[in-house]
Structure formats: structure tokens, C-alpha cells
Amino acid sequence: MPKEHKKRGRREEQKKRKRDHDHVDAAPKRLKKEDDVELESIENGEAFHHEPVDVTRPGELTYYGMLDDEEQEYFKRADEMLELNQFEDPEARNLFLASVYKEADGKELKIANSQSCSRLLERLILLSSPDQLKNLFQKFNGHFLNLVQHRFASHCCEALFIHAAPVVTLELAEPQTLQTPPSSDPNAIIVSMESLFLYTLAELEEHLGYLMTDRFASHVLRVLLVVLSGAPLAKENKNKSVLQSKRKEKVGIAGTERGQDWVLEKRPVPKSFLEALEKTINASASTLDTANLRLLATHPLGNPTLQLLLKLELAHFGKSRAKDENSIIHKMLPDDPIAEGTESAAFINGLVYDPIGSRLLETIIESAPGKLFKQIYSEFFKERMGSLSRNEIAGYVAGKILERLGKDDLDEAMRQIVEQIPNLVERNRTAIIKTLLERCIARNVDISLIKDQLEAVYSGPNGFEVTRILRVSESPAENLKQNGKQDHSPEKVHGSLLAQTMMAVDGPLGDLIFDSLAKLTPELSVQLARDPTASRTLQAALTAEHASVIFRRKMIQQFYGHVGELALDPAASRVIDAVWHGTHGLAFIRERIAEELAENENSLRESFVGRAVWRNWRMDLYKRKRGDWVKQSKYTAGNDGFQSFPESNGESSTTPPHRQSHAQNQRGGKHMSAIELARQKHAAKAVEAKKREAQTDKKMKREKKDKHVGVAESSKGKEKASVVAQ
């Protein structure tokens, strides 16, 4: 039976939006366990509102009406123009923004609730001035309770809070900005952004318990709490899902970085914000008893909010609050001491293997006072670190525990986990090994046992094989998924991160990676450079602090004849950029790579990534003034120029090549060319000549001074004799 014909544009619009009802309700593809949890957190969010939680529930959402066809068409065109950002200058864009705001006056609530036009409001917020943000805040005032619960308007509220937060800090630092009303409306009432935020919180605080588990409002509430606390909100945030849905569409402006990622620096906030935050935390704790708080711990939407409240409570108001009976942490874990058989013990044991609850347990371990953490660790985890590390979910809890252990406890935990390394590698659970390595290095714990286990597990016919840890096969076809795309699996990413951590260690552990990379065939090295995940390890190896000249020379020479094609590859081009830094002390090899780039000039200039490599290697200067490029290249590559292998320096054959170079440099037995020896000899002669000249000048000054003193004493003697005669 033929399928129903659907318009391509509408289908593409739905795919781009990622926020419509059909996308959420559609049956998702079979994913990993963690991804299923994220999907369930959206699909089942409303179901949890029927849990027996004693909260004040708001009424039905207000309907604000719809835009007519002409208005929708205008705002869609305006959205496209802002997205393309093809204005002559900022002034032209500001005039356009003003005209759009004028057209939207009185229709802001309709636009925010519109599936097709709410994106326009988000882009307007990204480019708005403080006065325009305040005006929009005032238009939303009194309607925030409805807006934060709406599928589309909630995104506008998030954007408004994020981009209005710096204005609060600006007004705090420069109070004079509040003295003059906006020039566009001299009769406008002056209101601070601080007051607007406090009005918003006052509007929502009666329904906080309900909003914590609302599928849309929970995200907005968490952003509002971060703004009130003054905490940073960075795009590198590991716990991004705590604040923002993974399905959130990125709305940005072409040619700018604004809006592509949420970035909010740590900033001072008014005292009223911290007071409001404390009041909110206390209200949340008083609204919910121990049973309901523990229910939120496994709630897909309530859990992230509970994590944030717990973290802010302990970070901003002191870890002594753990003793306060009305605090969130004390209500969740009221037993003192927390021992087996208590309700608190049952609660903790229930969180360890729960895909949602374990995230709250990680936050408790990370933020709890030292006394409480030690009590929890010794009672529940001290003898179980090995078994915890094996589990897919509990392994992340074990990682957080390792980050807080002292040297003695860490050494004991390390010995438990080392025994599980073969099992961990077999199950692709290498993230915990990476964390263990990092903590042992930080605490100065002996890592020889870890090194021995890793060497045994990843060894092949030719000894340690880095391709095993990077999950790269000699056959390129095996490195692709069934759909033909590169494999970006978490297991492969974790393997690359583990290899990079090993290279950061100066000694036998790092030597495993360096020596294995140096033994790769040119074909496999090129394949490694083209792999988006494994190439990160190669970049780190070429720029590593402990990478020797010998290793870098061997590694870079494997790319000879392939530099042009690698510079055109999105992943391998970054390796070619790293070669620039990797040729420090190898000026001749740097020039050899530049020659290959010059031979492929036309193809490089036609490619986006190729042009980036051309620019980073300063190839325009190479083409115009090669002599100047060579001089600069030799200067930045080091004064030693090309360094040869120390083949007859008497090093033991058991010493790895890149360690031999390090030992040779320590003895000062570095090979020097004839011209360098001549320069050194000339410099030594010049220093000797200056010393002799300085000594001569000093001697002459001393003789002159002695002569002057003798004349003065002679004249004084004559004067004295004359007086006696008289």
C-alpha cells in the first residue's frame, strides 16, 4: 500500500525543531540503558505528578491566542534574517531589532507560545539591549507561572534568565545606570533587573514543589536557581543535563558564538539574591518530608533539581548545614550514625545501582562534609571498591569516591580495582581506570601495579599495542559502523582518554604509548590520524611534555607523502596542526612538511579545513618570503635545528629511544654542527675579551684614585708645615 505523501519542507522543519509533540511521542530507536533513562525522563515526566507528594498545584494553563497568518509570515521572515545575520553593520541590525520589537508589541505572549515563532523571540533575546530585556521581562511579569510550563515558552524564559543575569551584575557595579530612564521613553518607570528577578521568583515560589517535577518548568527553575546563586554556567559543564535537556535545540546567530552554548561566568550577585535562594531552599525542604525527598531522588525530572538544591545548600551556606534538622541533606539522611539496618543505609544502597538515583549519590559524595563522607565511605564502600568499579552504573559512583580519598585509602582502593582491570577492559569500562590513574598521580601513589596490568591486558604478538586501547583495526572497513559512519562509541572515546592520561605520566607507563605509536606502520599511522576519536591521542602525543625528539621524529616521518591528503581531512588536519608544535627542535622536518603543503596549495585553498591548516602553518609567508619563513621556523622550532639520532653515544640498548635522548641532553653530550661549534668558540672569546677589558679599566681607575689620594695628602702636609713655621 503506498505511503501518504508528506511535504518535504514540513518534515525538515519538524526535524530541525526537535520540540514538537510528534517527536516526543514517537517510539525511539533502541538505545543504551542510559539513553533510555533520558527518554523516559521526558515521556514519563507528567506521570510522576500523580505521585502522593503534598504540593500546591497550579491551575490550567492560560491560552493567549494565536498569531494570524500575516503575522506568522512576518515573524518567520524576521527569524530567518536574524539567523543569517547578513546586515551591513551593527547599526542596521539594531534598527531591524527595534522594528521587530515594535511589531511584536502586545503580542509577546502569543509569540512565546507559538511553535513556529518562539525561536524568533529566543534570537531577539540573544541580541537585545538591557532596556529591551527589561521591557520583555515586564511583559512576561504575572505570566511566568504559565510560560515556564509551556513547551515552547519555557525555552524563551530560559534564554531571558541567562542573558539578563549579567545585567544584574552590571547594575550592581554601576548604580548610575539606574538613574536615567531609557531615552526612547522618558516617562518609563525605572526598575532594576534585580527587582524583576525577585518578582519572578515570588510568582513561582508558591508552586515550587510542583514545578520541580514538571517536564518543562523544571529546567527553567534550575536555571533561575543558578542565576540567583551567581554560580558559573559553562559549556564545558560535565553535568549539563542537570540544567538543560539534552534535546534542547541550539538557537544561535550566524557569524557569532552567542547562543550556541550556554556560558555564564561566575559573578557577584546582590545580597537579596542569596537571601531569596536560601528562602527557596528552606521552602523546598519544609514542603517535602523525608519520604517525598527520597521519592524525588529517583524521579527523572525531580532528581536534577534536587541535586542542584543540595549542591547550592552546601556550597553557599556552609557544610555545617548538614547538622541542621531542616536542611535537605539532613532530611534525606537523618540517622546518626548511618549504619547498616537504618533507613538511611537502605536509601544509600538503593541509590548505588539506580540509573537515576546514582547521580544524586554522586552529588552527595562530592559535596558532603568530610565527616559525613568518611562515615558513608567506611560503612558502605571501603570493602566494595572492586565490585563497584565493575558495574556500569556504580562505576561512576566509585569514580567520585576516588576523587575524595586520601593517600592511604586511595592506595587500598587502587589494589582492589587493579585486580579488576582485565574484567574492566573486557567490558569496556575504562573510565574508572582513567580516574584511578589521575588520582594516584595527584596523591603520589605508586602506579606500577596499574602499569603492569595495562601492559598485560593490551599486549599482542608484538608487545603492547596502542591500537587495542584505541579500538582501531588495521582494516579501515572494520572501523566503520554498519551505516558507514565513523564509530564514535563511548567505549572508543574512553579508550582514547585513557591513552592520553597514560602519556601524561613521565616514566614506564607513558613509554608504553610512545613506543607503540613509534612502531606503527605508515599506513596505520595515517589511518589513526583520520580517525576522529583516535586522532586526539595522536595530537596529544605530538605535543606531550614528555615526548622526546626521537619519538616525534619517527612519528612525523610516517606522514611523509600523505601530508596533503591529511590536511584535507577534518580529523587529520588537526594532527597536521599538532605537527607544527611536534617539530620543536626539528626545524628541517618542519620545512619538509611545509614543502608538501605547498605542493598541494590548490586543493588546500579549495577546502575549509585545508585553508585552516594553510593559515596555521603561515604558508602565505612561505610562498612569498621563504627565507623569512625559514628563519622564523628555525627560531620557533628551537636553535638546535635538525637533531640526529644518538646512535653511538654509548647508551644501553635496553633504554627506550626517546628516553635515550632525554638522558643524553642531561649529560650535555648533544651533537653540534661545525658552525655551531664555531659560534660557541667565538662567543667564548668575546666573553674573555670583555672580562680582560673590564679588569684593565678597573686597574686603571684604582691607580688613578691612589695617585689622587697621594697628591691630596702631600698638599695637606705642606699646609701644616707652613702653619707651624708661622
From Swiss-Prot:
GO terms for biological process: endonucleolytic cleavage in 5'-ETS of tricistronic rRNA transcript (SSU-rRNA, 5.8S rRNA, LSU-rRNA); endonucleolytic cleavage in ITS1 to separate SSU-rRNA from 5.8S rRNA and LSU-rRNA from tricistronic rRNA transcript (SSU-rRNA, 5.8S rRNA, LSU-rRNA); endonucleolytic cleavage to generate mature 5'-end of SSU-rRNA from (SSU-rRNA, 5.8S rRNA, LSU-rRNA); ribosomal small subunit export from nucleus. One of its GO terms (cellular component) is preribosome, small subunit precursor. Residues 640-667 have a biased composition (Polar residues). One of its GO terms (molecular function) is RNA binding. This is Nucleolar protein 9. Keywords: Nucleus, Repeat, Ribosome biogenesis, rRNA processing. InterPro entries: ARM-like, ARM-type_fold, NOP9, Pumilio_RNA-bd_rpt. It is found in: Nucleus, Nucleolus. Residues 10-35, 685-700, 706-726 have a biased composition (Basic and acidic residues).
